[in-house]
Regions:
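Short helix-initiation/N-cap motifs at beta->coil->alpha
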Residues: 9-10, 26-29, 43-57, 68
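Short helices/loops that flank or line small-molecule/ion binding pockets
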Residues: 15-16, 36-37, 49-72, 76
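Periplasmic-binding protein-like
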Residues: 1-5, 71, 75-115, 133
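A conserved helix-loop-strand patch within extracytoplasmic ligand-binding domains
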Residues: 1-32, 39-42, 104
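Sec/Tat-exported extracytoplasmic proteins
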Residues: 7, 26, 38, 59, ...
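Extended ligand-binding regions for polar small-molecule ligands
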Residues: 11, 20-21, 26-28, 95-133
Length: 133
């Protein structure tokens, strides 16, 4: 998880998030994390871009979101926002996985498909389409 704040924000620690308004996408880890911070007003959104737009427009103080979309939004809103690794706030690292039965013959095929998606630009195009809109 990453925290996105306004470029001029003084938020740098977990204590700085207390009693703030924090945006997150509905049903995500960011939503659950924000609900656990003391005094926070949690604002949820159907789309992450809406949370970040509200941040840029001063309606929320921070957005808690996954690393990849945070990096996309940092580029999209360059100079208006900054991103901070959630480890600075005590958030645990979260990874993605595809679960398969042990010894599955699909492992090599799935790994190759993922490599191909990255190599031919499909992965980046999907990120831009669904995260960076």
């Amino acid at each position: 998880q990453y925290v996105i704040v306004a470029a001029d924000s003084d938020v740098t620690t977990a204590d700085d998030l207390k009693n703030k308004t924090i945006g997150s996408q509905l049903g995500t880890t960011g939503m659950f994390l924000s609900e656990d911070i003391e005094g926070v007003t949690a604002q949820t959104y159907n789309r992450a871009i809406d949370a970040v737009n509200d941040l840029v427009n001063g309606r929320v103080d921070a957005v808690i979101i996954d690393k990849n979309p945070a990096e996309v939004f940092n580029t999209k809103f360059e100079g208006k926002v900054k991103i901070i690794d959630g480890a600075e706030f005590g958030f645990e690292t979260e990874e993605y996985a595809i679960a398969l039965p042990k010894g599955s013959e699909l492992v090599d095929q799935i790994n190759q498909a993922l490599e191909d998606l990255k190599a031919d630009g499909t992965f980046d195009a999907l990120v831009a389409q669904y995260i960076g809109e």
